[in-house]
Amino acid sequence: MHSIPADTGHTPSRAPAGNGSPPADVAFPKAIKSYVRRAGRTTTGQAKALETFGSQFVLDYTPGPLDAQAAFGRAAPLILEIGFGMGEATAHIAGVRPQDDFLCCEVHEPGVGALLKRIGERGLTNIRILQHDAVEVIDHMLPEGSLDGVHIFFPDPWHKKRHNKRRLVQPPLVAKLARRLKPGGYLHCATDWQPYAEQMLEVLSAEPLLANSADGYAPQPDYRPLTKFENRGLRLGHGVWDILFRRVA
């Protein structure tokens, strides 16, 4: 059975920590968004899914604590996903983990429509979408200790060195996420860009509320599928790195 990474009960090892300090010219939280503006056309199928399922599965952004039990209609572990692209991995994970609820942030309408289409096709009930910047959602809708897990899969790597400061996984955001995790909750990042993987490992290792669940990079958890894009990269010899940390008490 697919499940969230097991808590082994022992103190996880920590990867070597860097200084964890953001560049001097980076201002938080306003300078870092959870998304990059992209052009994209909403297809007919996506538009139909938005019309058919949007009112049921897309939540309004409202500053103030989210009532997750009311939003999902039950009390269950809550996982935040920051940026889900076209929703391929999101729908798979929600399907193999029906016991968990997934609050998914994505601003791009084609992606929202694509995930809604998958929700309808698969009869998923444990996903809710916020078409809003995840940083503002974290700041204004998610109280401390409200999350059981966080997924950040393949965020924009900002390849050029002068753009590295725009990367999402930076110390201030990680500190916010760590405080919003319950003790034992997890933060799972994945990237196919090794320099970003190294930065992720350094930043997460420097956060005192988090401890590495592995000795460095983690094995790919069974719940995270290989996407078509990822499979293509692997065929071309590209690597993929998973980083999995847990909130300490």
Swiss-Prot record:
Binding-site positions, S-adenosyl-L-methionine: E81, E106, D133, D156
An example Gene Ontology CC term for this record: tRNA methyltransferase complex
Region (Interaction with RNA): 162-167
Catalysed reactions listed for this entry: guanosine(46) in tRNA + S-adenosyl-L-methionine = N(7)-methylguanosine(46) in tRNA + S-adenosyl-L-homocysteine
Pfam annotation, one family: Methyltransf_4
Active site: D156
Taxonomic superkingdom: Bacteria
EC number: 2.1.1.33
Enzyme class: transferase
Annotated metabolic or biological route of this protein: tRNA modification; N(7)-methylguanine-tRNA biosynthesis
Molecular functions (GO terms): tRNA (guanine(46)-N7)-methyltransferase activity
Keywords: Methyltransferase, S-adenosyl-L-methionine, Transferase, tRNA processing
Family affiliation: Belongs to the class I-like SAM-binding methyltransferase superfamily. TrmB family.
UniProt function note: Catalyzes the formation of N(7)-methylguanine at position 46 (m7G46) in tRNA.
Alphabetical list of PANTHER family matching this protein: 3-DEOXY-D-MANNO-OCTULOSONIC-ACID TRANSFERASE/TRNA GUANINE-N 7 - -METHYLTRANSFERASE, PENTACOTRIPEPTIDE-REPEAT REGION OF PRORP DOMAIN-CONTAINING PROTEIN
Protein name as annotated: tRNA (guanine-N(7)-)-methyltransferase
Organism, as annotated: Paracidovorax citrulli (strain AAC00-1)
